[in-house]
């Protein structure tokens, strides 16, 4: 298994993984699937901002992906990013999520980011455990802020401080 930077050719596999999460999980709070052009536009937008899109690959097959983007689009949040990590269902439980997220944390540090935020559906105990194990702490619990599959969803926010800068002008 290798982790590498994605390229445009990976967008079809990324779309498949994304759409599975849309249809079968509460990890993505969208109701409709997307086409490859949608994920290609998403990929290109990340590239324009200098943000990484990583894929895990085994025997030439994309098994997962990870990325981060602006947490909020205001200048004051320029050192804070929110990330996403998704693993193909046939490859879950093999530690790929941990490997992708660890590499993504390294990339955020390389990009000079200060905080990485995770927004996790509160019933996703595996994701919350993974984030705790990598140093993330719970910073907020937001009950019933989303809906999917005919039920209210709670949101857990977790964050990881990526550096030790005492003040923003030290960044």
Curated annotation (Swiss-Prot):
CDD domains: NAT_SF (cd04301). The keyword Acyltransferase applies. Disruption phenotype: In minimal medium, cells lacking this gene grow normally with MSO, but growth is inhibited by MSX. In rich medium, growth of cells lacking this gene are partially inhibited by MSX, only when its concentration is at least 50 uM. Its EC number is 2.3.1.-. Substrate binds at residues 72-74, 82-84. Acetyl-CoA binds at residues 85-87, 93-98, 124, 133. GO terms for molecular function: acyltransferase activity, transferring groups other than amino-acyl groups. Residues 1-163 form the N-acetyltransferase domain. InterPro entries: Acyl_CoA_acyltransferase, GNAT_dom. Keywords: Acyltransferase, Transferase. It catalyses: L-methionine sulfoximine + acetyl-CoA = N-acetyl-L-methionine sulfoximine + CoA + H(+); L-methionine sulfone + acetyl-CoA = N-acetyl-L-methionine sulfone + CoA + H(+). Pfam families: Acetyltransf_1. Plays a role in the resistance against the toxic effects of L-methionine sulfoximine (MSX), a rare amino acid which inhibits glutamine synthetase (GlnA). Catalyzes the acetylation of MSX. It can also use L-methionine sulfone (MSO). Also catalyzes the acylation of free L-amino acids using an acyl-CoA as acyl donor. Homodimer. This is L-methionine sulfoximine/L-methionine sulfone acetyltransferase.
